[in-house]
Amino acid sequence: MTRDVRQLFGTDGVRGRANFEPMTVETSVLLGKAVAGVLLEKHAGKHRVVVGKDTRLSGYMFENALIAGLTSMGIETLMLGPIPTPGVAFITRAYRADAGIMISASHNPYRDNGIKIFSSDGFKIGQAVEERIEAMVASKDFGKLPDDHAVGKNKRVKDATGRYIEYAKATFPKGRTLKGLRIVLDCAHGATYRVAPSVFEELDAEVICYGCEPSGCNINAGCGALWPSTIQKAVIEHKADVGIALDGDGDRLIMVDEKGHIVDGDMLLSICASDLKRRQALSDNRVVATVMTNFGVLRYLESLGIQVTISPVGDRHVLQHMLENQAVLGGEQSGHMIFLDYNTTGDGIVSALQVLRIMIESESTLSDLTACIAKSPQALINVPVTKKVPLESLANVQGVLKEVKEVLGDSGRILLRYSGTENICRVMVEGTKKHQVDSLAKTIVDVVEAEIGAEISE
């Protein structure tokens, strides 16, 4: 059956439930062929593609399927095994590969999986390339197949994680260590379960690990960046200096201070932006944030003389606005933070190292660094939905939004949007009084659930 353009790719690559379209072995083989076809359209000859994955059970079958499609077209593949998404971006550049592929559904449950594709420069491919890949998959016209002696070889790269560990450590100042710091680390049973403990331990920190025993079916399950309550308790229990929570593919970071308080992506962005400005390393005194960024955080950044460019939600949009505005730092509340001086995509480990460096150099605790940032009261609730009906077509939803806006007046704001990667509607309400914000958000949630709500599946 012929697919319409953009039926495969979403806001962050291809994603869906494993063994359901588009995340099937059959479609993955076609995607591998299509990636090869796009490379061969640029120029004939030898090409190589690196392939990494997180710890999902379904990663094995998608790894084999993609490699089969690529090698059938004459492409050499380099199999990295479990490695964070930013590790794939780095290895793609380091090995001078023509493309990189990460098999992951990021922060989604284990039953989902996805495919992210990087170009040779380590940036995620753009929409035009995605559309060309989709067109090839739909037509199954990948160009001439190679002769039997010219099919591609697949090689396992044994030192890929070691290279990434050394790269990550190199972003920390030479001569400095993490000696004396006790860190609670939650790797979400995901792609960082080996590399993250190694990075922090080799820099001489005392590391207490959680979420470092992947089973293939426990990635992001009540742990990691989406569930920081795990390390909140652990930081207090172990009298740790800081908690670090990464998501399943290692491109998000949420931290916890020594008092057990969550420090989200907005706060981390503020800390790092302030440091870069102080060191005169913040290009054009500008950072990129998103429409979800807390208004109090925006006020704080502006009080420092930092210009803030606002992008839609999603690390792809953040990166696009960074490149357009020549910004070196961008991030979002969920914990994606991009340091273009270090990597071409969000990197949770590298981001954590920058925050730890700031703590050490300023002789401050994490709570000291956040004390001057007054966040506005905000409620953010995720509502599982059966389908993504255009919100403007739902009269009852529009009605409650109007009512809530009238209550908030000019002292608050509402944001209602669908997730680009899950069947979820995000309800965000911001204002001046926490109890009012929570109540108004619940009012909106009740209406959204009544209109399009879905039962939560286990």
Curated annotation (Swiss-Prot):
Designated name of the protein: Phosphoglucosamine mutase
Cofactor(s) the record lists: Mg(2+)
Enzyme class of the recorded protein, top EC level: isomerase
Keyword Isomerase: yes
Superkingdom to which the source organism belongs: Bacteria
GO cellular component, one term: cytosol
GO molecular function: magnesium ion binding; phosphoglucosamine mutase activity; phosphomannomutase activity
Family affiliation: Belongs to the phosphohexose mutase family.
Species per Swiss-Prot/TrEMBL record: Chlamydia trachomatis serovar A (strain ATCC VR-571B / DSM 19440 / HAR-13)
